[in-house]
């Protein structure tokens, strides 16, 4: 990017995930990008959106987040359309975290559906997944309203809503014993990095850890589900 974007050129991050890091275990995209893109204002464009629905001009709401209020306002103005609403925010870490964690939780939701555990279980899983997201966000200094907004809850609900979600489809295949889809499931690669970062931060993410054990650790699904369900339930 530095070769094509002169210093002072805004860079908008649209990807969702983490980058492995030898010190912290993993970095969220703004953390990784800042030292590599010095002198270039950063922003994130994120939220609950399936690309094909955006292309079909179906109503969509996204978040433009930047440390610089003028940049988030500029992005919102440039990309807004009759069917595309862009809200503005300043919490880039919260926006990046929500987009990364939801991919892992969506795999768990898919496994839940593939195992035939029911709608009650899926609702509980999504809610507790949001709680895990909020715990890590608090540790990293993110804003709680970001996690309860489009980049957090909004993206999580969409990604856990059905097979249209690549990560949920991947989890469903695992849970039902069917061939794993060849399409990219970002959560598959994010799970281990997220686990490493959360351990660095001393934050426990039971659902995310379970997904990593199943996807990358070759742990039996039934064994891991039983372990999750046997955990003591504390204060919500």
PLM regions and their residue ranges:
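Rossmann-like NAD(P)(H) cofactor-binding subdomain of soluble oxidoreductases
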Residues: 1-57, 75-77
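Internal alpha-helical scaffold of NAD(P)-dependent oxidoreductase catalytic cores
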Residues: 4, 32-42, 59-146
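Glycine/charged-rich beta-loop-alpha catalytic/anionic-binding loops adjacent to active sites
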Residues: 9-11, 89, 175-177
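General beta-strand structural signal in soluble alpha/beta enzymes
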Residues: 13, 41-46, 86-90, 149, ...
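Glycine-rich beta-alpha junction loops
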Residues: 18, 46-52, 68, 90-94, ...
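Catalytic cores of large soluble enzymes that bind and process phosphate-bearing ligands
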Residues: 25, 67, 118, 125, ...
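NAD(P)-dependent Rossmann-like dehydrogenase/reductase catalytic/cofactor-binding core
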Residues: 102, 109-113, 138-148, 152-236
């Amino acid at each position: 990017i530095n070769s094509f974007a002169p210093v002072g050129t805004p860079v908008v991050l649209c990807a969702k995930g983490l980058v492995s890091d030898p010190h912290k275990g993993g970095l969220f995209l703004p953390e990784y990008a800042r030292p590599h893109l010095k002198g270039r204002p950063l922003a994130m464009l994120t939220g609950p959106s399936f690309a094909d629905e955006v292309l079909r001009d179906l109503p969509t709401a996204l978040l433009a987040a930047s440390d610089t209020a003028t940049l988030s306002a500029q992005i919102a103005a440039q990309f807004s359309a009759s069917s595309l609403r862009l809200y503005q925010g300043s919490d880039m870490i919260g926006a990046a975290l929500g987009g990364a964690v939801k991919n892992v939780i969506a795999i768990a939701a898919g496994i839940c559906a593939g195992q035939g555990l029911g709608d009650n279980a899926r609702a509980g899983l999504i809610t507790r997944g949001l709680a895990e997201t909020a715990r890590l966000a608090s540790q990293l200094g993110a804003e709680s309203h970001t996690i309860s907004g489009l980049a957090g809850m909004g993206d999580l609900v969409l990604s856990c809503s059905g097979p249209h979600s690549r990560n949920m489809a991947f989890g469903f295949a695992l849970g039902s014993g069917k061939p794993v889809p060849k399409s990219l499931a970002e959560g598959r690669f994010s799970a281990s990095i997220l686990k490493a970062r959360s351990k660095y931060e001393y934050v426990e993410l039971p659902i995310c850890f379970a997904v990593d054990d199943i996807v990358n650790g070759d742990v039996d699904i039934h064994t891991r589900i039983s372990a999750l369900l046997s955990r003591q339930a504390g204060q919500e």
